[in-house]
């Protein structure tokens, strides 16, 4: 997956590795533009769960693994709910719910919500983090019912 680099490689938390230019790229979501090439190549979709590190696979519940049936997307239901400000249990629950309710109407609502969030600059970071916290087994809630349709 093609992506602009906004952090330095190496040890340390995201705040220490995030460059000044990278912070501006992430705030504006311009770091995602190269991923349009991935969409054109068929490796990603416009809408779908955001790609996550392979190391997270072992942490998913059976229900959360539903996200793996779909191509990763530029924008997903979890991002539409608040980008990086969405906590992991809710993010994974929303990704699983999206995988079970695919529709053009839902995709259009997700794209609109993501556009509004990007323009507003909301949700770029999780509270207390330079980006978002890493996923760990402690952050995953038991499987839950999909959120109510609204």
Model-inferred region functions:
Residues 1-150:
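Conserved small/aromatic sequence motifs within transmembrane helices
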